[in-house]
Structure formats: structure tokens, C-alpha cells
């Protein structure tokens, strides 16, 4: 005999609750705390973490100041002010990158031109030497 519809839905909700509850319990008891995670790091990484903690705290305080000034202003939230939006292209960085690549290309081009000029000078010098040798060894006034 088939069970009533409400019993089947009760089973569905009970199984769903067990799945969600077991997931939450697993997450709670298997995820390490911050102290456990730091203690499990190697000594070098732990030292690096400790030295950079003050820097991260200063960054966080600076961010909170910016957030407070942004919250006090009458401008819309999408005008981020001193904070650069991740969706806006950072034109300054792009320009610096282009200038760096252009300067590097100019240096490479100058070096290539110097190398070519040096090779050309060597070829001209060899050509002049060969011409002088031919002129010195050949008598131009003899017909035979």
C-alpha cells in the first residue's frame, strides 16, 4: 500500500535536513581554526606571516578609512573614489607597460643598427683592401 503524500514529503525534508546538517557538522569539525592553520605552517612561512601581519592590518585600516569617507559622501556607490574598480582598465599601468615595451624596442633597434653599421664598415674596409690589392698588383697600361 502506498503511503500518503505528506509522509513522502516529510521523508524528503528529513533526508534533506540530515544531508545539510551533516555537511554543516563536517565543515565545523574538519575546518582548522586560524591558530591551527598558522601552527601547521613551516617556520619560514610562519615568520613571513608574522612579519606581514602589521602590513595587512595597516592596509585594512586604510581600506576602512576609504570606506567611511565613501559612505559619508553623496556620490553613488559605483564611483569608488580613490579605490580603483576592478572592471575599469588601469590606464596608467597600461601606459607604463606600453612605454616600457617601446623603450625596450628602441634599445633593441639601436643595438641592431649599431651591429649592422659595424658589419657594413667591416665589409667596406675589406672591399677597399681588396680593391687596393688589385690596383697595386695589376698594371693598367699593359694591353697584353
UniProtKB/Swiss-Prot annotation:
Membrane topology: Single-pass membrane protein
Transmembrane segments: 5-27
Coiled-coil region list: 106-139
Function in brief: Essential for the assembly of ubiquinol-cytochrome c reductase. It has a direct effect on the correct occurrence of the Rieske protein, core 4, core 5 and apocytochrome b.
Name recorded for this polypeptide: Assembly factor CBP4
Entry keyword set: Chaperone, Coiled coil, Membrane, Mitochondrion, Mitochondrion inner membrane, Transmembrane, Transmembrane helix
GO cellular component: mitochondrial inner membrane
Location(s), subcellular: Mitochondrion inner membrane
Family: Belongs to the CBP4 family.
One Gene Ontology term from the biological process aspect of the record: mitochondrial respiratory chain complex III assembly
Amino acid at each position: 500500500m502506498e503511503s500518503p503524500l505528506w509522509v513522502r514529503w516529510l521523508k524528503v525534508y528529513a533526508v534533506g535536513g540530515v544531508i545539510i546538517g551533516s555537511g554543516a557538522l563536517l565543515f565545523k569539525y574538519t575546518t582548522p581554526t586560524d591558530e591551527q592553520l598558522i601552527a601547521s605552517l613551516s617556520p619560514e612561512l610562519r615568520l613571513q606571516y608574522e612579519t606581514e601581519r602589521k602590513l595587512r592590518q595597516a592596509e585594512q585600516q586604510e581600506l576602512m578609512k576609504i570606506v567611511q569617507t565613501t559612505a559619508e559622501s553623496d556620490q553613488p556607490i559605483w564611483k569608488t573614489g580613490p579605490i580603483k574598480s576592478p572592471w575599469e582598465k588601469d590606464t596608467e599601468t597600461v601606459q607604463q607597460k606600453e612605454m616600457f615595451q617601446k623603450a625596450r624596442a628602441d634599445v633593441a633597434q639601436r643595438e641592431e643598427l649599431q651591429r649592422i653599421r659595424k658589419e657594413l664598415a667591416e665589409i667596406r674596409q675589406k672591399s677597399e683592401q681588396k680593391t687596393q690589392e688589385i690596383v697595386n698588383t695589376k698594371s693598367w697600361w699593359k694591353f697584353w
